Amino acid sequence: MDEEPERTKRWEGGYERTWEILKEDESGSLKATIEDILFKAKRKRVFEHHGQVRLGMMRHLYVVVDGSRTMEDQDLKPNRLTCTLKLLEYFVEEYFDQNPISQIGIIVTKSKRAEKLTELSGNPRKHITSLKKAVDMTCHGEPSLYNSLSMAMQTLKHMPGHTSREVLIIFSSLTTCDPSNIYDLIKSLKAAKIRVSIIGLSAEVRVCTALARETGGTYHVILDESHYKELLTHHVSPPPASSNSECSLIRMGFPQHTIASLSDQDAKPSFSMAHLDSNTEPGLTLGGYFCPQCRAKYCELPVECKICGLTLVSAPHLARSYHHLFPLDAFQEIPLEEHNGERFCYACQGELKDQHVYVCSVCQNVFCVDCDVFVHDSLHCCPGCIHKIPVPSGI
């Protein structure tokens, strides 16, 4: 009984004696402390990369969304469901920006069942449209982890061995209603090399801990909305690939976009293979991307040809995936007083006013904290190093 008060307070540890963090400066202001907290938050993600490790570049990810009655709770505003769907819209955009040759699918579980909101696809607009429509979804019943994971596994287990197979579960409930022993399913997921990660919205659940541990995934419980967004962002970058996963050359096609007009006598309207699966899209169109192997037409890339199975991509898609393999090294942090050069950021040309500046170890150019974060999060290459590369004389 003596341990009970201590155990009930343990989750509140991050909020104990918070006044000790705040320190006044000589003028009695707390501005310096607040700026330091914001600065550390900005710099945190710069160091969160895997380094020189093997990554699963071609990803197949199913996102399982809890649609049970607990999603109507209002601890996230306006409620858990609306907040989750908004954050997932942001996640889908970031996911395809950083993983353009990957695919994603969405599953909703409620009333002890699981149903697909979207199939595995590389089209972000399709997923975002479905997420916007799901705001009006009614939340009721209990979720079923077993049915959701079974549905995801039925598709993922047929994916090629050189791709990563992942499931991300947004779990709000503290219970799951399953038709069979979920621990047997966990063994099947592990055998199929499917990595399952969970983001909990309520509290830690034992079966989720076992699920993440056995499949090599992660399990976190959110603190607030900003922490929720941060946890989702962690799943944007590709995870390290297992050492025994297949490694082989992949055939890819690079179709050029053909533009045709009605005035062109040789132009012939044709069906897009993507339109054949949808009744809402127009049928016959001019131009598009034509598979170099079988000449099947598609309206956008990347896509896997439904006729010959060739992966169709563009060169920028591969370039945007390449930076994960060789992440930019973190810039060296030095106090502003120790910097003897110009007091201007090399990237934005703004005056350096922060207490610390950041120096590229290769080109020795200096950056402010905002440009440092932008370079590592979005640009993925140092502007100073690029400008030092000599341009061929023939160009």
From Swiss-Prot:
Localization of this protein: Nucleus
Record protein name field: General transcription factor IIH subunit 2
Designated gene of the protein: GTF2H2
Record flagged with keyword Phosphoprotein: yes
A GO molecular function held by the record: zinc ion binding
Positions of the VWFA domain: 60-236
Organism, scientific name: Bos taurus
Entry-linked SMART domains: C1_4, VWA
GO BP terms in the entry: nucleotide-excision repair; regulation of transcription by RNA polymerase II; transcription by RNA polymerase II
